[in-house]
Amino acid sequence: MTDAYSNAGFDTGEIGYGERLAILVVDFQLGCTDPKYPLGRLPMVHKAVENTARLLKVARSKNVPVAKSYTAYGSRQDMPYWKVKPLIDDFIYGHPSTELNPLIHDPDYDFTFCKSAPSIFFNSPLTTYLFRQGVDTVIITGCTTSGCVRASIVDAFSHGLRVIVPEECTGDAEEEPHRINLRDCGRRYADITTLESVINYLETL
């Protein structure tokens, strides 16, 4: 962190874990993770899927709630004004691009739902689910770091949740926006940590 941010009082310490946590997985659907689709050709995202699969295996073994989103629409008529052509063309209900990546999907365990905006919280059933589970801490994973993940971090913070982000479990098209957005969120809204650190914590539950 630069002296300007430090001198202004940013990043004053860790938020830490609360009493009950959940894992949130943002948009690891085939349209974002399978190379057959234009948005699915990002090596950093592929690695994030593999890392998140490791995290979820431990989380499920500890009975930690897991909530996953995918993005889809009925038609272009109910889409926001996206500037992402593959999303506009493919992310329609029933299209294969909206199916979740099998590496991270456990339909018998996870709470899975469709979202229609960048944030996993916006107009979705997630808040009610987390309330019913007694969750006060969320570990956010998914793609992309500078888009839907950042929007979800800010909304989680705005809902009064503790936010933890294992950096290896998120990905973007390029390293720079990934790094800059995580660093900035870490100054303000979230603890940015490592996959191993989160797994080590889960093992204590």
Where are these regions (language model features)?
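Short glycine/serine/threonine-rich phosphate/pyrophosphate-binding segments
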Residues: T145-S152
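Active-site acidic carboxylates
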Residues: M1-D106, L202-L205
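Internal catalytic-core helix/loop-beta-alpha segment
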Residues: G94-C143
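A charged, well-structured terminal subsegment
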Residues: Y189-L205
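A short glycine-rich beta-strand->turn/loop micro-motif centered on a GG-aromatic cluster
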Residues: I139-G142, R162-E175
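Glycine-centered short loops/turns at secondary-structure junctions
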Residues: S61-V64, G134, G160
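Active-site-proximal loop->helix
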Residues: A173-G186
